[in-house]
Amino acid sequence: MRQGLLVLALVLVLVLVLAAGSQVQEWYPRESHALNWNKFSGFWYILATATDAQGFLPARDKRKLGASVVKVNKVGQLRVLLAFRRGQGCGRAQPRHPGTSGHLWASLSVKGVKAFHVLSTDYSYGLVYLRLGRATQNYKNLLLFHRQNVSSFQSLKEFMDACDILGLSKAAVILPKDASRTHTILP
């Protein structure tokens, strides 16, 4: 009788652990097969970010809104430009997307871009997961894109919930407005 209860308890613990792990996997970056890349294309403000990579953002006193331009070059090829204002101008990254699956692979200009996932969007905002790294190093980056330079409460809440799931809550930053030159990265 005791062995039966012990086995039952172990099975119950195993089922609970597997269920908890699968819930994270269901949300954790998934493919965006239903994403309309033409609607997602265009200019975006980067209103918030969370990262575990050092040096991804300027110093705290120099942080301003970032910007991004997403463009479909041709069928199956996506080009993404990210810019954050720095003391000497904008820091830019131009990774390219060779397939249609939602993954963004690095071009020669940016080494170490492993993935670009759109986790959630209604085409007025986008929650984007960017994975950077080389060899055994991996860095998680979560970006909140918005068409306007202000965000809704709901999209900020979704951003913070995603930060919790990815373990980036302490690194979450809401970027202050800067209307001076963010629009200058437009092609």
UniProtKB/Swiss-Prot annotation:
Q: Which UniProt keywords apply?
A: Acetylation, Disulfide bond, Glycoprotein, Secreted, Signal, Transport
Glycan attachment positions? N149
Signal peptide as annotated in the record: 1-19
Query: What Gene3D superfamilies is this protein classified in?
Result: 2.40.128.20
Positions where N6-acetyllysine occurs in the chain: K170
**Annotated compartments:** Secreted
| Assigned GO CC terms | extracellular region
PROSITE patterns in alphabetical order? LIPOCALIN
Q: Does the keyword Membrane apply?
A: no
Q: Which GO terms describe its biological process?
A: heart development; inflammatory response; macrophage activation; response to lipopolysaccharide; response to type II interferon; response to X-ray
Q: What is this protein's function per UniProt?
A: May play a role in male fertility. May act as a retinoid carrier protein within the epididymis.
Q: Which family does it belong to?
A: Belongs to the calycin superfamily. Lipocalin family.
Q: What is the official name of this protein in its record?
A: Epididymal-specific lipocalin-10
Gene assigned in the entry = LCN10
